[in-house]
Amino acid sequence: MKVLILGSGVIGVTSAYYLAGAGHDVTVVDRQPEPALETSFANAGEVSPGYSSPWAGPGVPVKAVKWLLMKHGPLVIRPKLDPVMWVWLLKMLRNCTSARYAVNKSRMIPIAEYSRDCLRDLRRDIGIQYDERSQGTLQLFRHQAQLDGTGEDIAVLKQYGVPFEVLGREGCIAVEPALAGVKEKFAGGLRLPQDETGDCHMFTQALAKHAQALGVRFMFNTGIDRIVTDGARVSGVVTSAGVLQADAYVLALGSWSSRLVAPLGISLPVYPVKGYSITVPIKDASGAPESTVMDESYKVAITRLGNRIRVGGTAEISGFSSKLYDARRATLDHSLTDLFPRGGDLSKATFWSGLRPMTPDGPPVIGPTQYANLHLNTGHGTLGWTMSCGSGRVLADMLSGKKPEVDVSALTVDRYAHRFG
């Protein structure tokens, strides 16, 4: 079957790889000159099934007010006269209940864990390299009250069988020795030993080459204008290279997915939430993190990627703006220098922002639409890297007529037919 994939981020490329492996004739279209140059370019670097949770949860509205007032707060809202933004925020607030949180998290954990297993299979099968490490992740609590308040999180981890360790100061230092010099700045941590780290951009570029070896064709520097339909089917995609036609179509355009399907009558509440990162050359290896340390107070992840440190964080709701703000850079700088003062050379850091494709309830949107030959693979939010391989494989199984190895029936766009979407 001839399949056209729109988007060459990590979701589009994993979808292409698995579809080609299943014997399909695959073409990937993207406006960029290479794969993974937008949201997949410089994310925090975590492959963290254990942290696969909805942003919408009980207590979040109250916390949001506090975050908005903090100097280095993790949340920024830049109000716009955009009804889509406000409708999306309202839908998110409707999901901030214990009952909805439990349902939404139960939909996220299986695909995240399956995806990590698929990633491990890829490493074994094709030897792909991407500055990967399998040393777990550490959620660091600066205050004892934060550590004491982990009961609900631990209960959820137990419920889903996710291995964890609650660590005091010395336990944190044992897994992250560079923290020894700042031990007065934290009370303890929660470690997830099965989580991994790696460079998403490096991975996606490498997997694209493997996909090409399987026959995948990439059409870069190609703008995507609109989708054309004929009754209950998609008949083509209008691009800067002309109208492209296939037997099946996969939409993996991240935050831009909603705009493309809205004219088709598909209500897809995926909205961009901007994240920022800095990438810092390691100055002193003994002063750098071994894996990922999540600074819970500022919601900042500090990750070692080869000879670099990636520092990522902030949730900025400001539409499709990619503008870089110095205040957001200051938050990332502060978290790094406060916890790993000897680790990186900030004078040589690069500053970046990307638009995370967020759903109001948390889980991604994977599966068929009202058009028989149009499938969605989008809305992964902060977990695109974590969920990428599993999402791509599930999508390939669907189009190949196979039953996916993990149940994703609750991840289709149809779930937004009820009021919580």
From Swiss-Prot:
Name of the coding gene: dadA
Enzyme Commission (EC) number: 1.4.99.-
Cellular component GO terms, alphabetical: cytoplasm; plasma membrane
Official protein name in the record: D-amino acid dehydrogenase
Names of required cofactors: FAD
Family as reported in the entry's similarity comment: Belongs to the DadA oxidoreductase family.
Catalytic activity line of the entry: a D-alpha-amino acid + A + H2O = a 2-oxocarboxylate + AH2 + NH4(+)
Keywords for the protein's UniProt record, in alphabetical order: FAD, Flavoprotein, Oxidoreductase
Species this protein is from: Bradyrhizobium diazoefficiens (strain JCM 10833 / BCRC 13528 / IAM 13628 / NBRC 14792 / USDA 110)
